[in-house]
Regions:
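Short, flexible helix-coil linker/hinge segments at the edges of structured domains or between repeats
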Residues: 108-112
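Transition-metal
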Residues: 1-107, 167-204
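Residue-level signature for short turns and capping positions that connect secondary-structure elements
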Residues: 78-80, 106, 143, 151, ...
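Conserved metal-binding segment of the jelly-roll/cupin
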Residues: 76, 129-148, 155-157
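A short hydrophobic beta-strand segment most commonly corresponding to one strand
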Residues: 88-90, 145-169
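Short, structured beta-strand/loop micro-motifs enriched in basic residues and often containing a Trp
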Residues: 114-121
């Protein structure tokens, strides 16, 4: 019997207004495979992915990100932390733009923390040009941000915790800014990871 995944669309302030949008808000993420994903058989039977694969805890989440605008500067928890570690990788599918990845070599911890608190943290991060076919790994504890104009396939460990360090002071449709998690984020940074990220190019087949 053949089963198909039923995707879940998630609205995000930085998302894309396209035919996949849900309601009137931009869709930023489409979750294709996660613990709550429903699988539908050719006979119409539905079952949760975690039950189908008999896997607890479910190890990964697979989704696409549709970024019309820059995502927040953020970091995910690392090893020996609570909540659990969150590694992830991005495969660039469409568009071109930049990815912020890791703290620039030679930046002191004190200078970085000051930059986070005064809103100049972007200047402290490595900037990578990204295009279809590129693959970039984001180990837990790496400060990063996806740039606008990119569509990426993201595979991550099953942890949904994100600490926002900077969000450009933007406001949602209700006029509210999104919550920042400065202290938690700084505590989650892997300070042993400095310098430019490794980027693998041409490993994902791009249309054309």
């Amino acid at each position: 019997m053949i089963y198909r995944c039923i995707p879940e669309k998630v609205e995000r302030i930085w998302g894309s207004l396209d035919p996949l949008r849900a309601g009137g808000e931009p869709v930023g993420e489409i979750w294709w495979f996660h613990p709550g994903t429903e699988l539908e058989s050719t006979g119409g039977e539905r079952v949760k992915a975690s039950s189908f694969f008999r896997c607890e805890p479910f190890p990964v989440i697979l989704k696409t990100l549709h970024a019309a605008r820059d995502l927040s500067v953020q970091v995910h928890p690392g090893r020996d932390r609570t909540p659990p570690m969150k590694d992830e990788s991005w495969a660039i599918l469409e568009g071109s733009g930049r990815i912020l990845h890791g703290i620039r070599e030679g930046t002191s911890r004190e200078a970085f923390e000051d930059a986070v608190r005064n809103g100049t943290v972007v200047s402290m991060l490595n900037s990578l040009n990204a295009s279809p076919g590129d693959l970039i790994h984001l180990p837990a504890g790496t400060v990063h941000a996806l740039g606008g104009g990119l569509t990426v396939l993201e595979i991550q460990l099953n942890c949904t915790v994100t600490y926002r360090l900077w969000d450009y002071r933007r406001r949602d449709s209700a006029g509210n800014t999104r919550e920042l998690h400065v202290e938690q984020g700084l505590d989650a940074v892997d300070w042993a990871r400095w310098g430019r990220a490794d980027k693998v190019t041409g490993c994902v087949a791009a249309e054309g």
